[in-house]
């Protein structure tokens, strides 16, 4: 695999990781990503909630979790409580309802700080990938100096592209958090 393709693949993976982290921030709107990764102890093992139930949005402030096996309702409820997400599950027969509370101004400010920190960490990861790729490029003696400069320029363009995507996602999430 070429250095450029490898660089783009690694940067895309870093962006995907950041995207998953951003989705997990609670904005006050119901979003299945809030609880998808919650772990639940069932069948003598630990499983992700998304593997045990369908998670749907009932309205802007409520999630409905429908377990594939109704016997897991109480375990799912316990798993959500244990995840410390400040969400209170309501068991109603064979489903679990979660009402998403209105976030306080203090909570929103804290989440925005976390978002900015995660955004910066993601951009640092992208820049580290750029540095590693440039180092590999310089060690590759097969390329001429002009070819190395051209590849470095392309790697920088990739870096800029991915950093802009991170900034765009971060700004959009800040708008979502601020407009609650």
Curated annotation (Swiss-Prot):
Record bears the keyword Transferase: no
Keywords of this entry: Cytoplasm, Protein biosynthesis
Entry-linked Pfam families: RRF
A cellular component term, taken from the record's GO annotations: cytoplasm
Listed Gene3D superfamilies: 3.30.1360.40, Ribosome-recycling factor
Localization per record: Cytoplasm
Predominant subcellular localization, coarse grouping: cytoplasm
A GO BP annotation: translational termination
Disulfide bonding pattern of the chain: none
Domain of life: Bacteria
InterPro entries associated with the record: Ribosome_recyc_fac, Ribosome_recyc_fac_dom, RRF_sf
Single GO MF descriptor: ribosomal large subunit binding
Protein family according to the UniProt entry: Belongs to the RRF family.
Function: Responsible for the release of ribosomes from messenger RNA at the termination of protein biosynthesis. May increase the efficiency of translation by recycling ribosomes from one round of translation to another.
UniProt protein name: Ribosome-recycling factor
